[in-house]
Structure formats: structure tokens, C-alpha cells
């Protein structure tokens, strides 16, 4: 025949995939044709080494054929299992029998247990805060970079950039304009500013953490005029939520009017809307910690705990969707969170967690109502205690105790990289993070 056939010189891998790994999950692989590399951006779980040591490449799309090894052995991806604990090289042969391309295939596996909470002690403050008088809070600058502020009094603070969370560099800050008798524990971060209520009912704010000015309450909207509105405490913030009509971040406070306490909200710290209902006696009034939880309906809820005026056997969180109407999250069962001094709540890694008290036990909850001791891997840092047996032949007893036990007063905040920062009254600082929240892609 006079027909001439021209065979393709295409020696590229068009698609690549592995057999499912754990729990039937199919991991996506990236093909870099320039570098001739194939890899997974989202690393496989810890322990996958025992699966990928003998696994099938179930997707390998080429126009020609593939060989492997020094001998260029013909490779059949549907029957030839491979060991991908180390990178391997596959050679693609084009149909023209001349053109070839080699691809390096790398399977990335997490080396850390994703469910472990890992703690690290950081650079201490240059001086210890006064007893029961310190507050840690995060403030973003104009470039949206986070700074960790620790207020040790109403005239002094320390600041460190969190640009490199592995390293703290403390700068002493002179604080001006903050009233001398302000409760530092009630400072709230809102719209890249810090706000606090003064005992005389005024609100003070700062955009740099050092210079504070009177925010100036201008108006209160509700059923009747408030002659002399006094802000008792600033509680928390609401996140913008289209489902509930919250158009922008909103500040929540409690104001005093005629001897009664009412909730109030503001989008600027000056103009406020007051609730109709008074505040329950069981609602937290001091050292409030807040977190944001998106419920099953997709609605954002602000959830708070703190010191209450009444004593109780349990720590009961309260939640709101609009800042004006609140409900407690008490449980009729025995699965309540035991009462603890100065509790801190966080919605973190898909669960609620409660820290505080003597810092021996963390309590966890799926929706904030029924509580249990946290998972074995989600603990405070522990120290090993070895007690010798009474007699020579008796085995020694090994127990573990929280390094935070009875460390005393503290303040806690969480940054955008999911680091939990705890500042202690002796000036020591610890940083913790759940491993999986540090992985690049979930």
C-alpha cells in the first residue's frame, strides 16, 4: 500500500489517580507537565504508609505505553501494584516509538497525627502581670496583619507581631487614655479596633492598642428614651450573616437603665439598639469568652461563657443570633460541663471545647449542650510522674498531670492560624494548635 501512517509523538500523562485510600477517599493528583512531576497537594492521612506500600495506580491515561525500572519493564497499572512510600519514576513512550518522557511520582503523607493538640512554650513577657489583672487580645493592623497584645495594667501592655507565630518579639507599649479602673478582662476586638466599657458607663476604643479615646455614645434606639445610657460591659461580637440579616460585624453590650440591664447592639460603637427584655441573672457578667458556631441550618451563632452573679454546679453557655435575644444551652442530663473558675469556650476543629478552672481537664461538646471529657489526644501539655513501688519488687506507678494545673490566672485568645494563645499570670506564654488545622489543605 502507498498509505503512510504518522504516529503520535505525544508522550504525556493526561490523567493520574490512585486506588482509594482510607475510608474510600479519592485523592486528587496534580500533573506538572513542565517539571514532569505528579503529586498530591492534599497529603494522605497519618498511617497511610501501610496502604501505599502496595497500591494500584487505577488511572493512568497515555496515548502510547508505560515502562518502569532500570530495565524499562512494561508497566500495567491495572495489575502491577507499586510501593509509593518513596517517589518512583515512570517512562511514557509515544506511539511513534521515538519520543519518551519521564515522570516523577510523589505521594505526600502527613507525618503528624491530625487529631493531636500540640503545645509549645513561647517567649515569656519581660515582666509578670499584676495579680488577676491582664488581658490577651489580637488586633489587626491596616495590612490585616495580626498582633498579640497583652495588657498588664491600664497604662502598660506588650505587643508582638504574629507574622511568624513560631517567634514572639515583645515590645513594651505605653497605654494612654484608658480609665484607671477599667476591667481589662472585658476588652473586645471589633472591626480592627479594641473596645472596652468604663465603670462610669462610657465606651473607650483604640485603633492601635496604645492610644485610647472615648468612643462617644450618641444614640440608643428602642421603645423609650434612655436618658443617661451607661454601658455595663461589652460582651462579644456578631459576625455578618445574610441568613439572619446581620449585614456587618456587630458589637454586643449590656447597658444599665433604671437599675435594669438590657442587651444592646451597634455597628459602630456609637449608635446602639436596645433589647426589650432584661438580662437574666444567670447571664455572664465578667471575664466573658466568646466563640462563633455555624449551626445545622447554616446560621452563625455567637456563644459565650463567663463569671455569673449566681453560683451554679455547671458552666452553661449562652447563644444569640441577633445580639438582643439570648438563650442558655443548659442540659437536663448529667452531661453538663462542671463549674470552673474563669471558663473559656471555643468552637475549634469541629467541636466546642471548654478550658479553665484548675486546668486539669478539657471538656468537649458537639453542639454545646452535652459535655464530656475531651478526646485522649486533645489535652493540656502533660508531665510524667513516676512513683516508686512501696516494696522493692513492686512496679512503679506512672501517672500524667497537666503542666497547666493550678497555674492560676490566665487569659486566652485564638489567632487566624488557629493557634490558641494562653498568657499566664507569671508571664509565661503557651501556644497550642490541633495538628489538622495547620495542614495546608483539608
Question: How would you describe each model-predicted region?
Answer:
Residues 128-146, 180-195, 225-250, 284-301, ...:
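Structural signature of eukaryotic scaffold interfaces centered on beta-propeller domains
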Residues 115-125, 167-179, 212-225, 273-281, ...:
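Beta-propeller fold detector
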Residues 385-442:
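Blade-level signature of beta-propeller repeat domains, shared across WD40, Kelch, NHL, RCC1
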Residues 152-163, 198-211, 245-269, 301, ...:
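Structural motif
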Residues 274, 282-292, 320, 328-330, ...:
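N-terminal export/ancillary region detector
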Residues 118-124, 139-177:
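Beta-propeller domains
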Residues 1-134:
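Predominantly extracytoplasmic/ectodomain segments of secreted and cell-surface proteins
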Residues 335-386:
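Loop/turn-rich, solvent-exposed surfaces of beta-rich toroidal or solenoidal domains
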